[in-house]
């Protein structure tokens, strides 16, 4: 890895009640690994009685979904390298097959989650594979996600 740290914001994404939605995905280039350094989730819930949102970080075996391309921003603008990964957000058609679930969190929609993985324990993605963050809310919610990725 070239120590190219990228910040990838999704903007606000609407979640429908009781429907899983992929809010962020990253695909590694064919011969390069990616490392997910951290993830931040911020909800706009207003009810204290809403059910926590299930957040799943999973491998995707077949994408096949329709999404918006997310534009990564370099942490250090002096680095000449260009981001090689493919980053997507706000899927309107879900990926067809999800693989192994790497992590699951339950987060109350009046709060958020700021998680930076411990050194050497970051989820790694081998070349040509995809990882995604899928959320399921019992009530309709709005979320903004920021991912920090190392290429």
Stretch-by-stretch model annotation:
Residues 1-151:
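Beta-strand-centric surfaces of beta-sandwich/beta-rich domains
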């Amino acid at each position: 890895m070239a120590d190219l740290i990228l910040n990838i914001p999704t903007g606000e994404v609407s979640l429908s009640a009781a429907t899983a939605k992929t809010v962020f995905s990253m695909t590694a280039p064919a011969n390069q690994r990616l490392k997910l350094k951290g993830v931040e989730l911020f909800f706009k819930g207003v009810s204290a009685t809403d059910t926590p949102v299930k957040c799943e970080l999973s491998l995707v075996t077949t994408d096949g979904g329709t999404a918006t391309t997310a534009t990564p921003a370099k942490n250090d603008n002096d680095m000449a390298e260009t981001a090689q990964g493919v980053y997507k957000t706000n899927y309107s058609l879900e990926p067809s097959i999800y693989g192994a679930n790497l992590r699951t969190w339950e987060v109350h929609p009046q709060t958020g989650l700021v998680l930076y993985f411990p050194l050497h324990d970051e989820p790694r993605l081998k070349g040509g594979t995809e990882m995604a963050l899928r959320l399921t809310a019992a009530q309709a919610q709005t979320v903004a996600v920021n991912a920090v990725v190392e290429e």
